[in-house]
Amino acid sequence: MQGQKSHSFKLFLWKNIFVVGASFCAVFFGLGFNSNEASALFVPTLSASVDQTNLQVNGNQVINSTDKTTEIPFNFTVNTNNRTGYTATLSSETENTALTNTGSLTGAKIDSISANLTLNNLPNNTWGYKFGASTNYAPIPALSTPVQIVQTTGKTNGNESNQLSIGMKLADNLESGNYINKLVISVISNPYERRAVMMTGKDFNRKVDSIVTSLSNDDGWGNKESVSHIRRSSASFSDIPAGAIDVENDEVSDYPIKIWYDATNKTIFYWAEANKIILNRDSRYMFRGFTKIEDIDISDFNSSEVEDMAYFFYKMKSLQSLDLSSFDTDNVTDMTGVFAYANSLKKLDLSNFNTSKVTNMSAMFHSMADLDELNISSVNTRKVTNMSGMFYGVSKLASLNLSNFDTGNVTDMGRMFSGMNSIQQLDLSHFNTGNVTAMNDMFSLMTSLTQINFGANFDTSNVTDMTGMFYQSTSLVNLDLSHFNTRKVKSMNSMFSQMSGLTILDISNFETPSLEDAGSMFAIDPGFSDNLEKIYVNQDFDTSKLTTSTNVFIRRNRLRGGNGSYLSDPSTADKTWLRVDRPGAQGYFTRKS
């Protein structure tokens, strides 16, 4: 208990003058803490006061007034640094809620109202209270049933003032005397569990740079090549090495968090008195560049508040296994590159991940070259807008089940599956791509891919970039593009380049009023088989906006137009060859109908 103030609330009758006075007992409780916890950073405080400790009213003036009512405002002020705020309650000091005439032989009193009422509707010789801007007065609560009048959720910004008002209505029949009661305002700090909160991921990473050896530079970032392990230390506070440094968020953490480097064991140790370490909302880059890490203990990290997890495990190239069963991702919105270049991980289980708030999954699994088992059955993609490079370079994964993917909000699928050269079949029948604008290199370098099921909702009507979309997908023999709408596409550069498995390409539904770049669109390079013989269309390409058309058909020596036309050196074909071959108008296309 930090303080107590006590005064009386009285009603006097003297020479036909009634004086009503108010007093309050204000009780304030602060948060206690264990003084033996020498490492604790944060000490909660709480103070409170009232600006009028003895309210008085001239009863005669009230009775002689037009409506026989009065309203007495007063303020109570609270100041606390408690991070969960405070709760204030109001009650009478006893079970008696009336203003009692202590000298009356008949037990005269001013009763509390029994229901919420406006001031003018108060019964004669009653009183009540109201809080703030409320228009109604409430009954005076008894000691056993205090009423909560304020509850906050955070520390005050300096002194926080709250207004209460006492209202009453008096009548001519009120017995002369001295009317008394006492009210109690209790201000209690809300329960608060002190926490160890980590600094931002980027700051943590830089702190590690400052204590480890064998750093190599990577675009201004240190690759921690001398670190093989990250583990929690069970040392007592007094046994922490002198060279340990602080990595807590000093604005919100109640405990210090220490890290140090053990060169003998090539280990980064972290230490905190708290059982769990709360990861920062911004944990981007936290473990970026631990290129030689073999194992990492994250079981005591609480990630429930993390919003940005981008590049969290980026370039952990030597990590063999990763247990994410304790990870809480409920609030994460950005998972860009979170596992990118963790290219020694063979298995990754995200079955416990809640990704319902994630909007960015670009490069999420980028270049996980050894990954051959991926569980993403529970991944929620409903809010995701960016999937660019999501599975880029996941070269050993032989199957990918995307049946649970909701892609209705995705706008960027560029390079999404590029380099997945062990995938043979890709089922996108559940994909809704109506909002996608970028599909550049989406299926490029998928050298084992033999079948893509696009489905009816694979909508390309808003796509503007199809650059390299099927580049070097050398095993595709059949390609059903019958649902493709290409009216907004500006670039088809290298779209079908290096597709050595195709003999026939049907793009009969293609329309190109926006096309600006068709460079190397059907090109084949040395070392790739040239098998393409026919390209079916329904109409000439619209080349009115075309600015780049070099090497469109380079080395396509087997390709013939519908009327048999071809060039001995296909690289010399200009944009006029992007048309149906017919007498008087040579082209490399064949009319389908």
Question: Predicted segment positions?
Answer:
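Sec-dependent, cleavable N-terminal signal peptides
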Residues: 1-41
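Negatively charged
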Residues: 192-593
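Signature of Gram-negative chaperone-usher
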Residues: 39-194
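Generic structural hydrophobic/aromatic packing signal, biased to beta-strands
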Residues: 11, 76-78, 88-90, 129-131, ...
